[in-house]
UniProtKB/Swiss-Prot annotation:
One of its GO terms (biological process) is defense response to virus. This is Detocs histidine-protein kinase DtcA. Keywords: Antiviral defense, Phosphoprotein, TPR repeat, Transferase, Two-component regulatory system. TPR repeats lie at residues 818-851. Sensor-kinase member of the two-component regulatory system Detocs that confers resistance to bacteriophage. When the system (DtcA-DtcB-DtcC) is expressed in a susceptible E.coli (strain MG1655) it confers resistance to bacteriophages T2, T4, T5, T7, SECphi4, SECphi6 and SECphi27; the level of resistance varies, resistance to T2, T7 and SECphi4 is not very high. Its EC number is 2.7.13.3. It is an enzyme of class 2 (transferase). It comes from Enterobacter cloacae (strain JD6301).
């Protein structure tokens, strides 16, 4: 007997009975929801989608379903992702969309409320009606509950209001969420809107999370993180269907937002979405959302009741250069719809052309003002930082990607991805954008003669550019250069560069880009990213120096303005350039060499770049002396250079002078190379610190509140200051900390830079291989190649055997090169932009110390404030040095020795193995020496006589002035022996004295210094006199007299900024570094210059 099939009505009753029984047996709404969706999930797994959807509709028809659906998809708690999702992996994406459409239809009334509230609240926030935004948001939450959108909107509202206390309270709630995904997601939402976290820091936090999943080899999670926390229409999500379906089920309003973002992205990406057209149409019948209605009209091609009249009117006026009318219309529209971002750019560019300020209020006014600043190059860096922050604060809104377009214009890409962002926003705000090259195929309206010729040509060229017809675009761009408005010229030149590059005319693109950069163009407005990457990756040995010079200029601009990624590539290009003009020695690198452009010397040959030029620059001292000679020429001939270049060279001379002293003293005064010029820093900071402390002391509210912003995977807490007073105290502390760590002249990073990173780590670790003949050669493309000496010494072996030797030794060189470069990159300061394990020197100020300093503001002066922070950071540095010696160096030793040992095991020739073994022994010694560098400089325990310090100073001067003979008359012997720890400061002050002699000496080829030493029980007095080249006039003598008068009281202030005799620096060394009672007096005559210094024994000077 055949089995009878149930009718649809019978099946509906049967299924509803099952659901009702399960619901009746449940103790509460949570259990009822779980059992009902368990039944639905089972059907989704085993039945066809049609059967599952039929069952779902039958469930929704139950009267009790409303409570269950509200419980599942709406809620008052902030654990917004605490939901056991349906098994969407069983469904095709079209079926997921169909199911979501059913959900949205069921909640249509709620979603209509949501659409209205979203528009109203967005308007309130952007137009600075913050109280209205708060009321509307609270009402919506009261009526419909909490979701990610309400939380993100509240955080953005608090950001624009500047309400830190309320923001703190909101963030505190996240720490108590038990659901892990909800807590993680909302934590990053909090960081995104945190007033004290920059956009760069937010991106870093996202990058850190991505780095962790990348290590675990989970590429799909990597894209999911980007999609959730840093979505961009320009990004490629290789499995968008998976990302969306895997995250689509959540609170109903978030589901709806996520669905819209998904379909807009798919449409914008060019994917086939024909299967979901009917679903979108169904939504338009029940949900009155202009974005969905516009999108449906786009994908269905049907006529629309919605017109783009407002937009078209603005654009018509814009392309006809009627900028005043554009401004008037735009402001009227934006006061009604401030989120109507498709008119931001014509409005902004019209303001720029008319040199007007926006009249719009609140955040929308700030967005426009900052954008105008960027296009006008006014307060550029600050405006870029602030606009980027606003972009991230508003990132939960899809219209915000127009701000992303603006930012893309200034990231070195020339906004190449902008069409994707424009198209994405067009998809939700416009039926048809007449300027969109995706939407419009007919540009007959351009034939209107009222439109200026240059404008018509530019739009046509942009169309060709969009379509990839770069040849046609190039012709039109080039023809428009002389006709366009001034404001468009730079944009046209950027497009011309990209066209040449895309047509394979690489050398032309490089030449044009280099010329623009040389003339001062902003690299961020040009396609420097693309060209610099090509130069770095495809660059090779050349004989054409014009091409090399252009490449070096581009790499230099990229390194300094985008990211310092291609330093070694710049070194290679510069070295190639110099070799082509037969410069093989550092002494040939001079301004007198007419084959070397002045810009090449002033800007390109930085210390970083010189350090990488290993064929010409042989040692760490050569690096410094080469740059020193360049700087000296600039300062001596300052009338030939701009003030910025001269000022930079003066500062660099001071820095190099000290570094040479540190290196020269390393044997006698210990090998330590870590140094902070605290006294100079204090003089530089003291005025600002005193002024800001005075303001802090007058604060009405000195509440010492902080709160935990987030806790990382290792349990480390990140705090944020919760009151204006605490934030201001912390900012002032960070100003001092930044000086200590990263000040370019006096901070600790300078000692890492010149003393270790670019002061010999590479040469030190390579020396053992070079000394024993197992170092490979480098090709002109900087690739390792076999050293011919290997075959010369062992040529009696067969070819296969020798090939094996070549292969293994080249691999060893490559491996060691990677290890050495990785180690070099770790010797950096980390002030928060890296994960802690990535760098050796990590500085983070603990919250307890901030609170301690904040509580002492009324009791301490500026000098004490700075000293307390310096002492705190000294302890941090000691910890870093311990880490370097006990972790970093042992790991480096293990990796290098292991690589050498593995190579030895592969090679069967005894003589080579002996060379490898000898290299291993010497490498151990080199690493031991490197370890000694990670100590404070000038910390030797070996006592010394004054004569030894004088001889060391003479040696340093011979390096600084190799042509000069320095003679001393008088006895250099003393009875008193100085403690070893004072060696470097004593040598420094002697060198300052002798350098002054050289400057004013009577003879250019030789000079004589008359030395007189007097010793008593508790003091040693040193007098140095020399004849001068030119007699001092009366004004100069009065200046010296004035110096004697103020020397004891104002040496700190003047030592930080003087560039003359160095007398104040000498006094500073005696008082602050040696910390001894002293006297300093200068006694010039008409034909001589003398200085006397007295050093008193305070119990810690002499042996």
């Amino acid at each position: 007997m055949n089995k009878k099939h149930s009718s649809p009505a019978q099946k509906k009753i049967s299924q509803q009975v099952v659901f009702q029984r399960r619901i009746n047996a449940s103790k509460n709404i949570e259990q009822a929801s779980n059992v009902c969706f368990s039944v639905l999930a089972k059907s989704m797994r085993k039945d066809s989608f049609t059967e599952f959807l039929y069952m779902f509709r039958n469930f929704l028809d139950l009267p009790v379903a409303k409570n269950i659906m509200n419980y599942r998809y709406k809620g008052d708690t902030i654990d917004i992702f605490n939901i056991k999702t349906m098994p969407f992996e069983m469904l095709e994406i079209r079926d997921v969309v169909k199911w979501l459409t059913e959900i949205f239809g069921y909640f249509s009334e709620d979603l209509n409320d949501f659409v209205k509230a979203k528009v109203a609240i967005t308007n309130n926030i952007l137009l600075a009606d913050f109280e209205g935004a708060k009321r509307n948001l609270e009402k919506f939450i009261d009526d419909h509950g909490v979701c990610n959108w309400t939380i993100a909107t509240e955080l953005s509202l608090l950001y624009f209001q500047g309400k830190i206390t309320e923001y703190k309270d909101k963030i505190k709630e996240f720490t108590h969420i038990e659901d892990g995904l909800s807590q993680s997601f909302l934590t990053y939402e909090g960081i995104r809107c945190n007033p004290s976290v920059t956009s760069e820091r937010y991106r870093f936090s996202i990058g850190k999370m991505i780095e962790e999943v990348r290590i675990d080899n989970q590429p799909q999670l990597e894209e999911t993180i980007k999609y959730r926390h840093d979505f961009s229409p320009c990004d490629v999500y290789s499995n968008m269907d998976f990302i969306f379906s895997n995250t689509c089920e959540k609170r109903i309003f978030d589901m709806y937002n996520s669905f819209k973002r998904f379909i807009f992205y798919k449409y914008n990406d060019g994917s086939d979405i024909s299967e979901i057209v009917t679903c979108v149409e169904k939504l338009t019948n029940s949900i009155h959302d202009s974005e969905i209605e516009i999108f449906y009209k786009r994908i269905s091609g049907t006529e629309s009741d919605i017109k783009d009249e407002q937009y078209n009117e603005v654009i018509d006026n814009y392309i006809n250069n009627n900028y005043e009318r554009v401004i008037t219309q735009s402001e009227k529209i934006l006061l009604e719809k401030p989120y109507f971002s498709v008119i931001y750019l014509p409005y902004i560019k019209s303001l720029v052309r008319k040199k007007q300020n926006t009249s719009l209020p609140g955040p929308i006014g700030e967005i426009i003002r900052l954008s105008c600043n960027l296009f006008s190059n006014i307060e550029f860096e600050d405006s870029l930082k602030k606009l980027s922050k606003i972009y991230y604060v508003l990132l939960h809104n899809d219209w915000v990607h127009i701000i992303g377009c603006i930012l893309d214009n200034f990231d070195g890409s020339d906004g190449i991805n902008n069409p994707k962002r424009y198209n994405y926003v067009d998809s939700l705000l416009l039926i048809n954008n007449k300027l969109s090259f995706r939407d419009s195929t007919n540009f007959k309206w351009l034939d209107d003669e009222n439109i200026s010729a240059w404008r018509r040509d530019k739009i046509k060229a942009d169309k060709y550019f969009y379509d990839g017809e770069y040849g046609k675009a190039l012709n039109l761009y080039s023809n428009s250069l002389d006709k366009s408005e001034k404001n468009y010229i730079e944009e046209l030149k950027a497009k011309i560069i990209y066209c040449h590059f895309s047509l394979g005319e690489i050398s032309v693109a490089i030449t044009i880009l280099s010329e623009l950069l040389s003339k001062g163009a902003n690299p961020r407005t040009l396609p420097i990213n693309t060209v610099a990457e090509y130069v770095a990756k495809e660059g090779h040995y050349k004989t054409n120096n014009d091409e090399l010079y252009n490449e070096a200029i581009i790499l230099n601009a990229y390194n300094k303005n985008i990211i310092a990624k291609y330093i070694q590539h710049t070194s290679n290009v510069c070295e190639n350039f110099l070799e082509n003009i037969d410069v093989t020695d550092k002494n040939q690198i001079t301004f007198e060499n007419e084959s070397i452009p002045a810009f090449f010397l002033t800007e390109l040959l930085s210390i970083d770049v010189l350090e990488g030029m290993t064929s010409i620059i042989e040692s760490e001292v050569d690096v410094l002396l080469t740059r020193l000679n360049i700087d000296r020429y600039i300062v001596t001939n300052e009338e030939k250079f701009d003030s910025k270049t001269v000022r930079k060279s003066k500062n660099e001379i001071t820095n190099i002078f000290y570094k040479l002293i540190v290196q020269a003293c390393s044997n006698e005064a210990g090998e330590g190379r870590i140094y902070v010029d605290k006294s100079s820093l204090k003089a530089k900071l003291i005025n600002d610190v005193e002024r800001e402390l005075e303001i802090l002391r007058g604060s009405d509210n000195k509440e010492l509140n902080t709160y935990v912003e987030l806790t990382d995977d290792h349990g480390i807490e990140y705090h944020t200051m919760s009151t204006p007073f605490m934030r201001d105290v912390f900012d002032l502390m960070m100003k001092v900390s930044d000086g200590y760590t990263i000040d370019k002249l006096y901070g600790i990073d300078q000692s890492l830079n010149v003393g270790i990173r670019h002061g010999g780590i590479v040469n030190l670790l390579w020396a053992p291989l070079k000394n024993n003949g197992i170092a490979a050669l480098k090709s002109k493309d900087s690739k390792f190649i076999p050293n011919p000496v290997w075959r010369n010494d062992f040529g009696y072996y067969n070819k296969g055997f020798l090939d094996s030797i070549d292969k293994n030794l080249v691999l060893l060189n490559e491996k060691l090169n990677t290890i050495i470069n990785d180690a070099k990159e770790k010797v950096h300061i980390n002030t928060g932009e890296f994960i802690e394990s990535a760098k050796v020197f990590n500085y983070a100020i603990e919250i307890e110390f901030v609170e301690e300093m904040a509580g002492s503001i009324d009791k301490i002066d500026g000098d004490t404030f700075i000293e307390l922070i310096f002492n705190y950071l000294d302890e941090k540095t000691n910890d870093c040095l311990d880490y370097a010696k006990n972790n970093f160096i042992p790991k480096l030793r293990h990796e290098m020795i292991d690589a050498i040992q593995n190579t030895r095991n592969e090679i069967k020739i005894e003589n080579i193995n002996r060379a490898i073994s000898q290299s291993k022994i010497q490498l151990e010694e080199s690493i031991e020496f490197l370890q000694s560098w990670f100590n404070w400089s000038g910390t030797s325990k070996t006592p010394f006589a004054l004569k030894a310090a004088i001889e060391k100073s003479r040696l340093i001067l011979s390096k600084l002035h190799p042509w000069l003979e320095i003679n001393f008359s008088g006895s250099l012997n003393t009875q008193k022996i100085f403690l070893g720890k004072h060696f470097t400061p004593i040598v420094t002050l002697l060198t300052l004295i002798f350098e002054n002699v050289v400057k004013h000496g009577a003879n250019r080829d030789s000079t004589e210094i008359i030395v007189d030493i007097n010793e008593n029980n508790d003091v040693i007095e040193l007098s140095f006199v020399n004849k001068v080249q030119e007699p001092f006039n009366q004004d100069e003598l009065e200046k010296f007299s004035r110096i004697n008068e103020i020397l004891d009281t104002e040496y700190e202030t003047y030592s930080a900024r003087e560039t003359g005799s160095g007398i104040f620096k000498i006094k500073k060394i005696l008082s602050l570094e040696l910390k001894c009672k002293n006297h300093v007096h200068i006694h010039p005559t008409e034909n001589s210059f003398g200085i006397t210094i007295g050093i008193y024994d305070n119990g810690g000077m002499f042996e």
